[in-house]
Structure formats: C-alpha cells, structure tokens
Amino acid sequence: MKILQIVPSISLVYGGPSQMVLGLSSALAKAGVEITIATTNSNGDVGQAPLDVPLGVPVAQNGYEIYYFRCSPFRRYKFSIELLQWLHKNSKAYDLAHIHALFSPVSSCSAAIARSQQLPYILRPLGTLDPADLQKKRQLKRLYAAVLERPNLAGAAAIHFTSEQEAKTSERFNTVTRDVVLPLGVSLPPSASSSIHEKYGIPKNKPILLFMSRIDPKKGLDLLLPVLENLGSDFHFVLAGGNPQDPSYEATIRDRIQYSQLKDKTSIVGFVTGGEKTALLEAADLFVLPSYYENFGIAVAEAMSVGTPVVISDQVHIWQDIERSRSGWIAQCNVESLTQALKEALANRVEQIQRGKNAQIFAQQNYSWDAIAQQVIKTYQDLI
C-alpha cells in the first residue's frame, strides 16, 4: 500500500497539526506502509527564511520519504506550483492521498488534482470546519468554500476528524461524505537535563502552571491572564509558545504580563522544542489550555503522556476523555469557571498527583502512534 501525505508545511514553527504528519508517517512506515510526504519549504509567514532542505527530490527520514517544494508565488499562503505539477505527474503511483488542512491553497488544489486523476483522498480539516473558525474572514471563506472546498469535500473518500466532537460540530457545506474519527498520537523526545528550572528562572518550591501552545486569540489567554492575576494562590506561570503568523498578538500578550502583577511570577520562555519541551511538560504541576475551540489539542495529550494533569476548557474537543478518565479539570470559557477549576486543582496536591497518573495511563492507551497507525491502516484499506 502506497500512501501520499500532503501537508502545506512540516516546519516546527507551525506546531502540532503539522508535526502530526511526521509522527503518523513514522508509525505507518514501521507497520509496513510505503509513505511519501509532499510539502513545501515554508518556515513561517513573516520574515523567516525558508527551510534549508533539498527541493524536488526524495529525502529519506524514519522509514518514509519527503519531497519538499519551493513556496511560490504566494509564500505567505504556503503555496507551491511545483508541488502541484509534481502531484499531477505522479498521482498514479499512489493508492490514496491523505490531505491535511482545508482553506489552504496547496491542499485545496491538491484535492482537485487528486479527484481529476481518480486518486482517492482523505481530507483532514484541522479544525477549519469549526463554525467559530469559519467566522474569521467569513465572506472570503464562503466564496472559497463554494469554489473549492465544497467540491473537495463532496469528492473525498472520507473526512478525517480527530474527535467525536469535531465531527459533530463541523460544517459540511451540504455535502454528504463518510466521517472517520481517528485521534492524534504523541511521541516526545527524551527529557533534557534537570537544569530547566535554572535556565528559565522557574522556582522549584512553587506549583508550576504551564501554558504551552501557539500564542493565538483562540487559545483563551484573554481568559487565563486575568484569572491568574486575581487567583490569590501561590504559583509560578510558564508561558511557552510563539506565533510567527501574528507576532503583534504575541507582543501584546508579553506586554500584558510585563505590566501586570504577573510579571514577578511568570517565565516567558518562547517557542521550545525537543528535550526542553519534554522537560517543561514534566516540570509542570498543571497544564492549562482554556481554548475557545480546539479540534484535538495535541499539547494536552503531550502533557498527559508525561503524567501532568490538565486544566482545559470544554471547547478542547477531547475534554470528555479527560473528564471520564479523571485526567484533569474542565472549565467553561469564562473567567468564573476557569478560576474555580484552577483553585480546585491547586488546592489538593494528592488529587493532582492521582489525576496525573490517570492522564499518563490514558495517554499510553489511547494516544500511542503504534495503536493509532493500525486504525489508520484499516481505514486506508477500507477506502482503497
């Protein structure tokens, strides 16, 4: 079975949704599936240099191969004419395409090419069909959907959602297409040295609250910061993440902290990867993500995998898994509910530890790439 994964970018700066493709591809290759990834060399949207990678030739990695193509002519939108030309020429070599992201020109055009070449394809929306997300640039998206995404959805072999709630709430533009619900997996590198506290000025004698995600309005920082400012408990807040697509919003959040009472109890560490990311997740007593909408929440699963309990909103679409497994605390998207959840979580260290253990067990059983790969393979086989 030969599968083509198409994704606008796999640069680290785009976070979990892009990195998921690498984890899935590695697990599928390990299970004997021939995997090719077609992507661009995009490495951020504002001023960053593109990835320094070979272009248009296969690059071997973890049992699969990657073709990188130059972003041109619309670099900001991760568009590549060369990728589309390659796909048109090589689509017959594959049994199925798994296309990641909607409302992204290279993905949308790839789906249209796959359809014209009779190559079955699965679409993974990455939360772009959430009604809240569709409100952003609403008129443009309605036009885009009418011209491109509605035919793409109608012609897809299946739509890949990562949670039951995402499947339930997503807009289909009056199309009827098979749903498949397949969660995302986590695979963290070994933890860095124990010097993480010293490096970032994180005290060892206070509860650590960690926010690790893209610094974006949808992540609920406008709720979290006022809650922390008035929480009254003794804690230290770690803000980890960045936003190369909207650096002005990131700067606004940094300034808000700098000029508030949180200044002396906050470490702003920026975008972290590798062993340092793992070390921060392990060092945290609570992982906090009060998003307004989140189709899965890969960072939540990563925190759970190292035994850190989570405090999340009921708009993170795996919240019911967290609630059933008692892996953390659930809040509504308002200041009062989030305050109550954090106070309850901080009040009982014994309960924190127990819910952290529950989280790790649940993640091992449900967010393992090897187990998820078997579900994905069965789905591929059903669709080919």
Language-model segments: residues:
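N-terminal subdomain of nucleotide-sugar transferases
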Residues: 1-53, 58-65, 229
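Conserved donor-binding/catalytic core segment of Leloir-type glycosyltransferases
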Residues: 4, 160, 202-219, 225-229, ...
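Glycosyltransferase donor-sugar binding loop
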Residues: 43-44, 186, 212, 236-254, ...
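Membrane-proximal helix-turn-helix segments that form the acceptor-binding/catalytic region
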Residues: 116, 142-158
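Helix-loop-beta element that forms the nucleotide-linked donor phosphate-binding surface
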Residues: 162, 166-186
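Aromatic "clamp/platform" in nucleotide-sugar-dependent glycosyltransferases that forms part
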Residues: 292
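Short hydrophobic beta-strand element within catalytic cores of glycosyltransferases
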Residues: 309-313
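Conserved acidic donor-binding segment of nucleotide-sugar-dependent glycosyltransferases
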Residues: 328-336, 344-350
